[in-house]
Design a protein with these regions (language model features):
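Extreme N-terminal starter segment of soluble prokaryotic enzymes
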Residues: 1-4
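Conserved SAM-binding loop
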Residues: 39
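Class I SAM-dependent methyltransferase "Motif I" SAM/SAH-binding loop
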Residues: 7-11
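Conserved SAM/SAH-binding beta-strand->alpha-helix loop
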Residues: 32-33
């Protein structure tokens, strides 16, 4: 069974799809205790770490890394402030990508990132993900 690591996992909606597709989610992460409760009610075998991603120092090996870092800074429904610290959590996803070196990764966010205010952040994400480790993701 292929392994997956999930970051910014929330209540596990996306991870439920991974499990249904045959993945073993070996680690999930978020900072919200209630999200962990819901997640583990549905996927009790997953190691769910409640911790700020910036403080996670080790990631398990996996064939797939998935994540949906917060979008409030980019979303039409949010404050849309380019300098909010949550707008830079993609760097933590890139750090995990470099550490794990999975065969593939999936990352999702809102279309507001293409807005001219945030375009430089989207371009930085693409650059960081493409250069993560020795694999050369495209």
């Amino acid at each position: 069974m292929p392994k997956a690591v999930s970051l910014f996992s929330g209540c596990g909606g996306s991870d439920a799809g991974l499990v249904k597709a045959g993945f073993d989610v070996v680690m999930a992460n978020d900072i919200l205790p209630y999200a962990r409760e819901v997640y583990l009610a549905n996927q009790p075998e997953t190691d769910y770490l409640i911790q700020d991603i910036r403080k996670v120092d080790k990631f398990p090996s996996a064939e797939l890394l998935v994540g949906c870092y917060p979008c409030q800074g980019f979303s039409q429904g949010g404050a849309r402030l380019a300098d909010r610290s949550i707008n830079f959590l993609y760097k933590e996803f890139a750090r995990a990508l470099t550490s794990i070196q999975p065969k593939a990764f999936i990352v999702e966010n809102v279309s507001g990132m293409r807005n001219s205010t945030f375009k430089h952040l989207l371009e930085d994400q693409i650059k960081r993900f493409s250069n993560a480790g020795s694999i050369g993701y495209k």
